[in-house]
């Protein structure tokens, strides 16, 4: 289902001019490249698909002193890619703060006994002190690894997530990794994800992907897992971090159409799933931004094709299932159609219930990796309209992909500052804003409903057909919550009769 609507291009262009007028000339010139309005849609491709132009600059270093909403390379590696691998211990190598303040913030669900065979929600740090900066921390790192192997013998590997001081003082974590891996006969992966590298968490994703290539795949080449037998319908689900159980909801659908998910990266993942990934027949990538690097490597090195899919909302679920099924042929295509038909009554019931309550409601999005585009059609499936969307750390190809989703006149903003985002929201007054925890409370103080689209506001899953029902319920609860009727003080709502005023 695709809604036919256009946004107010003139208003959105006026808003861009307004926010730029408040900057000094040099800053305004730089920020102008990051703000745009989606231009007219044109027909592209054999199926007549329409495409909007989202012409903004991206993946550029933020201006110092201007508050933006980005993270660092350490956040991209440890917090996104490696952290959810459940049977490995992930050391935050450096001062305690980075690990402490990022401890268990992402809702990466997993199955296992924490502290015994799974370690996702635990925080391990080398707790760098001043003397470690002066004399180096390699010996301390060796001691930390020894202690982990003694205290947690059921771990299947260790990653070393280096923080800023490690790169600045030049510690050789690679040498320590090789030494201790041989000594303990285990996998130890050094990740050079110091926070000062790159312009955002996006480089941390890339570095983490490279670490998988260099320290997992290359080490495993030539080795065969005799317990793992390949099949014709083996797939890897890559870039799904199981926020609120998303990966499990996606896996249900893929298995129902006849595929076997042999690895899920990296929500609820094990090291073994990562190691055997090159033996799958197809890589299905959900978060393109964070995991396209390793998919491209596997395509070049192991000839494994990859495709992007989207399980947000019934329109994209159906399109993705059919696209995936076409890769495997008539048998899987037939099963995919049966699965789509099976869930159609559920979809119809959800839409019948929530469409009257949500139709025409306007939404602004500002999130990370893929959600500023992937969730658009899920909102439209409920009759809602996207008036603005943007990314914290996107690259140019992300905005090219966004053109397939947005309508003409949509406000586009990259690496938005707090001032820009607040101004856009205050002037547009959407019915709902979907963004992160830092934006949640300022938006609610404006009297505008909000949903946290990084962690689903502690709800979920939002993937799959079951997830769509939860998604619709949550959007309805946010927008139609009676609390918004209490936002204005009673005395501001009161109207005093003219006659009464005259009598006084």
From Swiss-Prot:
Function: This molybdenum-iron protein is part of the nitrogenase complex that catalyzes the key enzymatic reactions in nitrogen fixation.
Listed EC numbers: 1.18.6.1
Catalysed reaction, written as an equation: N2 + 8 reduced [2Fe-2S]-[ferredoxin] + 16 ATP + 16 H2O = H2 + 8 oxidized [2Fe-2S]-[ferredoxin] + 2 NH4(+) + 16 ADP + 16 phosphate + 6 H(+)
Enzyme class: oxidoreductase
Recorded GO CC terms: molybdenum-iron nitrogenase complex
Cofactor binding summary note: Binds 1 [8Fe-7S] cluster per heterodimer. Binds 1 [7Fe-Mo-9S-C-homocitryl] cluster per subunit.
Protein name: Nitrogenase molybdenum-iron protein alpha chain
Superkingdom of origin: Bacteria
Keywords from the UniProt entry: ATP-binding, Iron, Iron-sulfur, Metal-binding, Molybdenum, Nitrogen fixation, Nucleotide-binding, Oxidoreductase, Plasmid
Gene Ontology terms: biological process: nitrogen fixation
Native source species: Sinorhizobium fredii (strain NBRC 101917 / NGR234)
